[in-house]
Structure formats: C-alpha cells, structure tokens
UniProtKB/Swiss-Prot annotation:
Organism listed in the record: Anaeromyxobacter sp. (strain K)
Annotated Gene3D superfamilies: Cell division protein FtsQ/DivIB, membrane protein fhac
Coiled-coil intervals: none
Transmembrane domains' residue ranges: 27-49
Residue numbers spanned by region Disordered: 266-294
GN (gene name): ftsQ
InterPro entries registered for this protein in UniProt: Cell_div_FtsQ/DivIB_C (IPR005548), FtsQ (IPR026579), FtsQ_C_sf (IPR045335), POTRA (IPR034746), POTRA_FtsQ_type (IPR013685)
Protein name stated in the entry: Cell division protein FtsQ
Function: Essential cell division protein.
Compartments, as annotated in UniProt: Cell inner membrane
Cytoplasmic compartment residues: 1-26
Amino acid sequence: MARGPNRRRVDRVPGERRRRLARAMALALPSILALAALGGAATLGWRVGWKSDLLRVREIRFEGLSRATPQELLDLSPVQPGDHLLFLDTDAMAAALRRHPWIASAQVRRTFPPALEVQLAERRPAALVDLGGLYLVDDRGEVFKRAVPGDGLDLPVITGIEREAWAEGRGELAPLLGGALALLGRWSARGLDARSTISEIHVDPEYGTTLWSDEGTEIRLGQGDLEEKLTRLHRVLSALDAEGERAEVLHLDNRRRPDWVAVRVAGRRGEPDGRSSYAAGGGGGPQGRSSSLR
C-alpha cells in the first residue's frame, strides 16, 4: 500500500537550514568583526599618519661636510623639512645631492623622532688640470669642477691636455691624467716632496712626462721605468744637496742610456746662476758646474 509524502520530514527541512546558517554566522562573526576593526584601524592610522605632524621630517642632518654647505645641499634636495617621513624617496635624494661638485657619495637614513641623517663623502682634490682654464681633479682622476679663488688650494698643475681633445676623447686621455696622479703619489711615497715640491706636471703621449719644482728645476722623466727613475732622482738630489748645488735641469729621459741622469747645475747657493752646461758623460757626482750621474 503506497504511502503519501512525509509531511513532518518536509516541514522540518527549512528549520534545519536556518539553524545551520545561524551556527555558521556565529562562528564567522568574530572574524568579520576583527577584519572590520583592522580595516577601521588601518584607515584611522593612515589618516592620522598622513594628516598629522607626527611623522613629518623635523630636521635634516648632514655629516661629513667640509667644502659643501648644508644650504647648498638643501637647495639641491627634493626632500625638505616638513615632508612625510614614510613617503619620501631617499634614493632620489641621494642622487640629487651627488650633483653637487664636491659630493662623491651620499647615503640617506630615516631616524626617529622624524628626521633624516645624511652621510656624505666629499671629493679629495689631488691636482689642478689646465683645460683652457684650471679645473680640480680628484684622487680617482675625475675632473669635477672649475677652480675658483675661494677653493683656497695650492696644488700642482697638470698641463699638456687640450680642452677640445679632452671633450672629444676623454677615455683616451684619461690614462695620461691617471699617470700624472700616480706620479704624484709615488713622489710623496718616496719622500721626494720633502726635497722638492712639484708645481707642474706636463704630460705628452710621445715624449713622456716633464716636471717643474717650486724652485724652478725642470725634471725630464720621459716614458717608462718610473720607479727606477725616481730612485736615481732621489740619489742625485741627495748628492746635489751634499755639495750645496741646485739643478736647473735633470734629464732622466735618455733612451740610449736610460740608467744615466744628466744634470745642468745652477750656481752654488749664494752664488749667481748661469755658469752651467749640459754634460755628455761623467763620474759619480756633481763636478764643477755640470755632471752626469748614474
């Protein structure tokens, strides 16, 4: 005998669904409320952080300055006091500061209370180079600014490089400039600066290097064998000092006899100059007004 539908079962289904939905809502409600709270807190934090002065840069501190001034750097900087600490670009600021001719490197760091700490390294000028005007060159061989009286620097001058040639072929001429700077370094390391200070270095790709001292002595080094030539030069200057002599010209550029030093000697100290001549050969020390040394 067939039975009709179970009305009690059918009637019970909607009630079970409502109870399941209620249980699910009860379980999910804490998570929903937590997410809402976090969203509200984030929105509030954003508004407070952005609109309030709590995270505004109060100070920009520059460290490592000697030549550049804080105001010059602030004029270059895209970041200023009052900018928001969290949304400024420290890399862009560092790049802008490096456009100052004296600045070699810059690192920007956020600090709290809201401020910026900028660590700077300035260029170290090693010489002047004549490029149709005097320019400063640093110890890495980079020409970085035109020299002005306010720089207050007494540096040797590198000559022999034409401005037009430098502008067109800097890469080809850079070794000449680098060689002159290396010579200055070796001159100082050998203690020669205590005997004679270099005032000018003339570089020539064909004939090599010629120096002039503050006393007016011309020193023709030529090309190659720098260390050996400086050793011989040191020995010659010591011998001249012992004899009370001063050289007008020293030749260390004899390609046929590279181990020789030809000296044109000026007058003895206290005596007038002009009684000197070039020597073609000789012994081991200054003799009279001229000599050749090995």
